[in-house]
């Protein structure tokens, strides 16, 4: 009887371990800077994570001046942004409030970039959904 109970406990624990291993790799990058070092870093990380874990879901959330990364007229890295956007598991999202505060329109952003009404809500929601969080800074 004890042996059967022991086997049952091991089976349940093993099931939990399998579930833990199946957790998706999801990370949100918080970019607020127009600094090219920060922008290069986030683009490099997208590439490195995508190579190491092809199924990883990655999102770059931009506000303050970070959204300039996805503005063709202001970004020095626009080709790298477009390359990163070819990965279907990568998304770029910009805070609508930041755009409004800076008199920038969505039409000025690279096609495919999404806007979110409130970036703080986006970040908190992602964390509640168990996304990893990385603040991009140097």
Locate predicted features:
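Secreted/extracellular ectodomain signature
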Residues: 21-138
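Bacterial Sec-dependent N-terminal signal peptides
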Residues: 1-22
């Amino acid at each position: 009887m004890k042996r059967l109970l022991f086997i049952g406990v091991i089976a349940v624990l093993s099931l939990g371990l399998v579930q833990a291993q199946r957790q998706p790799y999801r990370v949100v990058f918080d970019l607020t800077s127009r600094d090219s070092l920060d922008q290069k870093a986030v683009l490099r990380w997208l590439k490195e994570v995508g190579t190491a874990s092809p199924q990883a879901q990655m999102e770059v959330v931009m506000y303050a001046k970070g959204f300039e990364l996805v503005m063709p007229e202001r970004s020095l890295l626009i080709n790298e942004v477009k390359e990163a956007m070819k990965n279907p598991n990568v998304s770029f999202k910009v805070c609508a409030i930041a755009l409004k505060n800076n008199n920038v329109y969505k039409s000025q952003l690279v096609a495919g970039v999404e806007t979110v009404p409130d970036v703080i809500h986006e970040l908190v929601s992602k964390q509640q959904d168990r996304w990893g969080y990385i603040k991009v800074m140097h």
